[in-house]
Amino acid sequence: MIPQTLEQLLSQAQSIAGLTFGELADELHIPVPPDLKRDKGWVGMLLERALGATAGSKAEQDFSHLGVELKTLPINAEGYPLETTFVSLAPLVQNSGVKWENSHVRHKLSCVLWMPIEGSRHIPLRERHIGAPILWKPTAEQERQLKQDWEELMDLIVLGKLDQITARIGEVMQLRPKGANSRAVTKGIGKNGEIIDTLPLGFYLRKEFTAQILNAFLDVKPL
């Protein structure tokens, strides 16, 4: 069922909290792979199916009619994120005049339904649990941090300084190669303004940032 309101979406998400992947997959008649090595997107697909997400692999938000993006957040036994969170691909060409206010990243992060999930690899996939959902909108300070990082990274892209971009740049968000392998190439802007072949780059939220979101929800002060 496709949720028609935020309340319906949150209610559906709360109804699957506490289930294991195996229990939910059996309910939806979806086969469970032995692990995620060849099925990296399986958990996201499972939750999308369970919650009635509409976007599939399109560039819009998962629940575009509600203005909500769905993000799974693998956490360890201590409740800390295990990995960075992909937001969207960076526009490496045709990006002059793009501002934070109308950027794809801001659109994707304007309202997120976070679904924490057990991610420790020693737990068999079928036995990993789904956590309580978090419906999140950036605070003014979080938006400031995201905007600052986005502008700094986009400046490097627009000015043809792709070779200067490293994963260390950015307080809460970073740019990293995004592709199934290093043979995936796209077009970008070179040092002299020429069009070059380069690796696709994606915006990723740092683990410290998503940990802050979890802590705020749990009202636990970070150590």
Curated annotation (Swiss-Prot):
InterPro entries: DNA_mismatch_repair_MutH (IPR004230), DNA_rep_MutH/RE_typeII_Sau3AI (IPR011337), DNA_rep_MutH/T2_RE_sf (IPR037057), Restrct_endonuc-II-like (IPR011335). One of its GO terms (cellular component) is cytoplasm. The keyword DNA repair applies. Its main location: cytoplasm. Keywords: Cytoplasm, DNA damage, DNA repair, Endonuclease, Hydrolase, Nuclease. CDD domains: MutH-like (cd00583). One of its GO terms (molecular function) is endonuclease activity. It is found in: Cytoplasm. The keyword Cytoplasm applies. It comes from the Bacteria. One of its GO terms (biological process) is mismatch repair. Pfam families: MutH (PF02976). Gene3D superfamilies: DNA mismatch repair MutH/Restriction endonuclease, type II. Sequence-specific endonuclease that cleaves unmethylated GATC sequences. It is involved in DNA mismatch repair. Belongs to the MutH family. This is DNA mismatch repair protein MutH. It comes from Haemophilus influenzae (strain PittGG).
